[in-house]
Amino acid sequence: MHQCVLKRSLFSLCIAGSAMHAHADTYAPWLTQVGITDSVMSAANWGRGLYLGVVDTGVKSNASVFASGQVSSSLSSCAAVSFKCSNGFQDDNGHGTAVAEIAAGYAKFAYASNYGGYKAAAGSVISVAPDANIIAEKVLNAAGSGYSTDVSNGIKKAADAGAAVINVSITYGNSADMVAAINYATAKGAMIVWAGGNSAQALLAGANTNGLTAAAVQRLLFVGSVNAKNALSSFSNTPGTGKLVVNSTTQTAYMGRWLMAPGEAILAPNVMAGSNAWSYWSGTSMSAPVVSGSLILLESAWPILRTNGTAANLLLATSTDLGSKGIDSSFGNGLMNLTAAFQPYGALTTTGANGKAYAISSLTGGLIGSGALGSMSSLQSKLSNYTAFDSYARNFTVNLSSLITSSKGVASLNPLPTNANKGPLVVKLNGGSEFAYWQQTLDLSPTTDVFGSNQYAQQQQGFAMMRLADGTQLSAGLGYAPQYAHQSALFDRHDVARLSLDLNSTDLHSLAQGGLMASVGLPLSGGDRLALSWSATGEPNPLLTAMMAQANKLSVGYSHGFSPALRMGVTYTSLNEQQGFMGSVFSQQSMLGLQGNSQSQALEFSSSYHLSQHQLLLAQFSVSATDGVSANGLLTGASGMHAQGFGLGWMNKQLWHEGDQLSLTVKQPLRLTAGSMGLWAARVDALGNPVYRTEKVSLVPDGRELDFKLAYETPLAHLQTLSLQTVYRHDVMHMQGVNDISVGGVWAKKF
């Protein structure tokens, strides 16, 4: 048991070491004062992997505040040239060990502490970079004395040993050997943090420092002391008006490289009073290691700061202003703020495949997932963890998934939300000819549709068809589903065409609908038929969508009757999409835009079988291929695509009485089976430099939509009909886990 020794705030006690640093920790108040949090520590990996050089009285390597091997025996040394070290780099004064612990001590403090305005809970983290390694360069003797030649040699040796940051809690001097040492160490990539001094005067009484290189100035920081209330410590030097002079035209005031950090009543070991003795230390010697440890954290989190030598500048730029507004001769840049330093500085940007830099804030939505590609969830996932860079070239993860949008399936009671029973009215003419027509004006009631046909809502729609006695068909329309016209021309049966409406979206027809359409059906010898059809998208409704694809398709079909009941057909379709790709929509001006038009071809196989005069079976299956498309933004292009769709329907045109009709259908809308998108994305190398490359992202949807529909229609009285329908959709838009059900009814009366 240790007895407390009251001697100038010195006391003895046992400390508990920490096995590791992770999860939520409690931090000493002088650490939270400068913005250290769990998120900062975890982002910096607690400073792991970097070396801190401590140029001082040495460091007691076996002190319980350090982890085993944390103070490097092979890299540390006695760097003094004016005296002989009695015990190598080991500390025989206590100052150097305290400084090293403040910057990078591994162990937490086991007891509660309340002194000097700081109240620390038991078990608090009390060091800035606990997992950093330490290089001790002993340059001061047991009395704490040494010469500039000793200090300059220690700085050089720390740099040669690989120190990323060198802490010098020693009176600053501007002698030639000190300047040469600073130039030498910074040329090797080290940052140097120098205590501002404890004489309560301007640094060097306003004298300049001559002979530093411009690179050295950018890697050099001075640190003054504040108390727990951010007031200037009574003993602390100030930057004054002196300058770091590179040449007659390049000069930087001390205040421009000056930061403030806590330096009063800082808890640290006092190894000269006992192996478990602690003291509350005060001085800019304590402020400097707070900044040194912070530089270690920054360079551990972002190696690019070490590569570019910009960590010190970042701390200056993100400091909290104290005293007079702006940089001043008392507080310099102000209080170091690690919370701010760990946030993006300046605009976050990314570089497109075209080599141009783009601000993340300027990127807007440019891709609407739909059709066979579903929601493009894999691409969205990649974009949700996209890498962007701030003005210090640091990598940050940003979420760009909102650049892709998609419709969501929602349960609905809207009456007849799909094309159920939208067959035209057929009028039989003398001589065996027929005339069919249909027209309506859609209301502005957007409903979920796989291919976005709701975009054309509140538009006049119509369709007219003439069938001659020899079987020739001619049709034209606006806004009507081209599937009906093509299947009618191919099979010469209204019931087949009518049932095919419920199987809409299983092929390329659905990607070019809503605008003008036309079809021709021609009888061939032996009862065979030839069908030609063309359709295009219409003008989008600006109230519903600001962006849509312009597409047109041409289809050629051939059918053969194997018996009066069985007919089979095959159709070739060519689809051209502008600002579209397999039903998805993009803006060519956006970062997710593709270049040029996309071209698709498809084969559709269909078969109708009449079970009886009133009962019909219809099966459809389509396969399609889409050519690859290039891009030059965040996307580098799309590979060739393959997709499939199928549907099966049954209809009874006279279930209980004449004129009623019942239909059952199941379909899988067109779905991508193979294809990928190239995403231009960055990773960082070991030095922190961005390395851009194309990442192939599969576009095959994670779900498979299946639609089940039951529809019934019956006449009620003269010119009155009742239509009922229920539809269940599984994995709507091929999005796994998104299901909906629609139930509705329509009573219609014609006058």
Predicted regions and their residues:
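Substrate-binding/access-modulating region of protease and related hydrolase catalytic domains
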Residues: T26, M41-R48, A121, A136-R219, ...
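Extracellular S/T/G-rich loop segment that most often corresponds to the catalytic His/Ser-adjacent loop
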Residues: D56-V59, S64, L212-I296
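C-terminal subdomain of the subtilisin-like protease fold in secreted/lumenal serine endopeptidases
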Residues: Q33-V40, K156, V165-N167, F222, ...
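Hydrolase catalytic cores
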Residues: A100-A103, K108, E137-L140, A164, ...
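Outer membrane beta-barrel translocator domains of Type V secretion systems
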Residues: L403-S606
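Outer membrane beta-barrel transmembrane domains
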Residues: D495-S510, A531-S533, A546-M548, G569-N597, ...
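Active-site core segment of subtilase-fold serine proteases
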Residues: T26-N133, A161
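Residues on the lipid-exposed face of transmembrane beta-strands in outer-membrane beta-barrel proteins
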Residues: G462-M466, A518-L522, V556-H560, F605-Y609, ...
